[in-house]
Amino acid sequence: MTSPAGPSSPTEQEVRSLVERVIDGVIGSDQPPRAEAGSPPQTTVPGDTKTRIAIGSDHGGYPLKEKIGFRLKEAGYEVLDCGTDSHDSVDYPDFAHAVASEVASGACRYGVIVDGAGIGSAMVANKVPGVRAAPCHDLSTARNSREHNHANVLTLGAGLIGDALAWQIVEEWLSVEWGGDRHARRVAKIDAIEQQYSKVGMRQDTG
């Protein structure tokens, strides 16, 4: 795993600036989103010893979440544990939402969520604007989600993968560089679509 020391990722302002340029040509148009060519600065993940990671799980993912949190702290990360805190039955949307909210607000740089399959938590997290959650089950999906999709939340299925593989996925996911270049244009389109529908929802709410 790459040491927590290294170059920093693009700032939220830089990412928002790129998205805003895309939005200018999308909102109010019936045409598919168009993004400008170009890429944000190349970055290495993670950035520094102050990198803060939110973790969370339901009851099924609780044991694995605890182990991942311990290993992250050993590696020098600051960890915010959003629960759950026991084996008692709970609903995964509550904890997936808590983790995603910490990432979306900027309080935490990344999030890791564990449930039975990693799918439901990803669905919940991706409802939160600004979050790009990816369920990963091997090293290839971990690399792809970071390099190609600029994922900022990782979801894992405790019922599908063992503890050793889960930690390898976390290590890989945190160490892979965001690819930028052609991927930046595509991720900007994802963000543009998100903002387009957010604005539509706001107009309906204020109707």
Describe every region a protein language model picked out.
Residues 1-50, 75:
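Protein-protein interaction and targeting regions used for scaffolding, dimerization, and localization
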Residues 2, 14-21, 45-48, 138-207:
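C-terminal binding/interaction regions
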Residues 51-57, 82, 113, 154-155:
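Short glycine-rich or small-residue beta-strand-to-loop segments that form or flank ligand, phosphate
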Residues 51-79:
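Glycine-rich phosphate/diphosphate-binding loop of Rossmann-like nucleotide-binding domains
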Residues 76-79, 131-138:
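Short hydrophobic/aromatic-enriched beta-strand-loop microsegments
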Residues 78-89:
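A short beta-strand-loop structural module common to alpha/beta enzyme folds
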Residues 90-111:
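N-terminal small/polar loop signature for handling phosphorylated ligands or for N-terminal nucleophile
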Residues 113-131:
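Compact, glycine-rich, soluble single-domain proteins
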